[in-house]
Structure formats: C-alpha cells, structure tokens
Amino acid sequence: MATNVGPQIRSGELVFGVAHIFASFNDTFVHITDLTGKETIVRVTGGMKVKTDRDESSPYAAMLAAQDAAAKCKEVGITALHIKIRATGGTATKTPGPGAQAALRALARAGMRIGRIEDVTPIPTDSTRRKGGRRGRRL
C-alpha cells in the first residue's frame, strides 16, 4: 500500500513551507522546512552544485540550489513558501551575499508561490568587540 508523504489537501489549495535562505559571502544555503521550522524538507547549498570553492556563493550556484529545492518541494506537495533571508550578521556583515536575490528569483521562477519575505539577520543590540583591532582594517 502506498502512503502519501505530504499533507492531505484539496486541489488548488496552497500548502505553505518556509524557505530559510542564508547568503554569506562564502556560500548560500536554501533550507526549506514546514511552517513550524522543526521538520526539514530539503536543504541544498551552493557548494553542492558547483565544483570550485570560489563559486559556492555565486548567484548561479544559488539559482541551481533553489531550483533543486523547489523540485523537491513539489514532490512533497508544498506549493507556496514564506521566505526568511539571512546574512551572516552579529559582528560580521549585515548585508546578504550575492546568492540571496538569485535564490529568491529562482524559487519564484520554478513555480513556487511566494508569501511573506522577511529579513532575519541577527543584529546585535550591544555586542562583543568587532574584529579588526583598535585602528581598524587597513587596506
């Protein structure tokens, strides 16, 4: 007897998941979970899609990762996504890497309906000392 993996729904009804896109300047993660965030459906990184280390964070690698993730979502039965974009944050950079926008566009182009888009980068309220020393990073 075959069992259905996804949720029981009527046709045409949107089933939401959450896409956690972590875009640093070294890699891009596309991690899709259920609405609670506890159950991982698929996690793909830019590094899994390209051979060279320097291309892990590229928009192309992020696009390939997002396409893979969207295909797996459709298999499971998820048709729509809320998106949480995150940069490294903390004492490091607070701007998302180059793969964030490409991953978001690829999810939309793959036929996933987009719900809410939210920036969840951790921002320090009063943090530890930032790296670089007293006189800062000298170029």
UniProtKB/Swiss-Prot annotation:
Q: Where in the cell does this protein reside?
A: Cytoplasm; Nucleus; Nucleus, Nucleolus
UniProt cross-references to Gene3D superfamilies, sorted A to Z: Ribosomal protein S11 (3.30.420.80)
Q: Additional comments on file? A: There are 2 genes for uS11 in S.pombe.
What is the species of this protein? Schizosaccharomyces pombe (strain 972 / ATCC 24843) (Fission yeast)
Subcellular location, principal:
cytoplasm
| GO MF, one example | structural constituent of ribosome
Q: Which InterPro entries match?
A: Ribosomal_uS11, Ribosomal_uS11_CS, Ribosomal_uS11_sf
A GO BP term here is: cytoplasmic translation
Recorded protein name is Small ribosomal subunit protein uS11B
Task performed by this protein:
Component of the ribosome, a large ribonucleoprotein complex responsible for the synthesis of proteins in the cell. The small ribosomal subunit (SSU) binds messenger RNAs (mRNAs) and translates the encoded message by selecting cognate aminoacyl-transfer RNA (tRNA) molecules. The large subunit (LSU) contains the ribosomal catalytic site termed the peptidyl transferase center (PTC), which catalyzes the formation of peptide bonds, thereby polymerizing the amino acids delivered by tRNAs into a polypeptide chain.
List, as start-end ranges, the regions of compositional bias called Basic residues. 130-139
Quaternary organization:
Component of the small ribosomal subunit (SSU). Mature yeast ribosomes consist of a small (40S) and a large (60S) subunit. The 40S small subunit contains 1 molecule of ribosomal RNA (18S rRNA) and at least 33 different proteins. The large 60S subunit contains 3 rRNA molecules (25S, 5.8S and 5S rRNA) and at least 46 different proteins. uS11 interacts with eS1 forming part of the mRNA exit tunnel. uS11 interacts with snoRNA U3. uS11 interacts with MPP10. Component of the ribosomal small subunit (SSU) processome composed of at least 40 protein subunits and snoRNA U3.
Pfam families per the UniProt record, alphabetical: Ribosomal_S11
Which segments does the entry list as coiled coil? none
Keywords recorded for this protein, A-Z? Cytoplasm, Nucleus, Ribonucleoprotein, Ribosomal protein
A GO CC annotation recorded here is:
cytosolic small ribosomal subunit
Q: Where is this region: Disordered?
A: 119-139
Q: Which family does it belong to?
A: Belongs to the universal ribosomal protein uS11 family.
